[in-house]
Amino acid sequence: MKVKPSVKPICDKCKVIRRHGRVMVICENLRHKQRQG
């Protein structure tokens, strides 16, 4: 999980979602998991 000021999808399978007011990227490649904060 990377915590970044701005999250962007890295590959085609990355999905940008909102959980509890936080913007997150989930992907089947676990290296692409990101959270804004």
Curated annotation (Swiss-Prot):
One of its GO terms (cellular component) is ribosome. The keyword Ribonucleoprotein applies. SUPFAM superfamilies: Ribosomal protein L36. Pfam families: Ribosomal_L36. GO terms for biological process: translation. Keywords: Ribonucleoprotein, Ribosomal protein. The keyword Zinc does not apply. GO terms for molecular function: structural constituent of ribosome. It comes from the Bacteria. InterPro entries: Ribosomal_bL36 (IPR000473), Ribosomal_bL36_sp (IPR035977). Belongs to the bacterial ribosomal protein bL36 family. This is Large ribosomal subunit protein bL36. It comes from Beutenbergia cavernae (strain ATCC BAA-8 / DSM 12333 / CCUG 43141 / JCM 11478 / NBRC 16432 / NCIMB 13614 / HKI 0122).
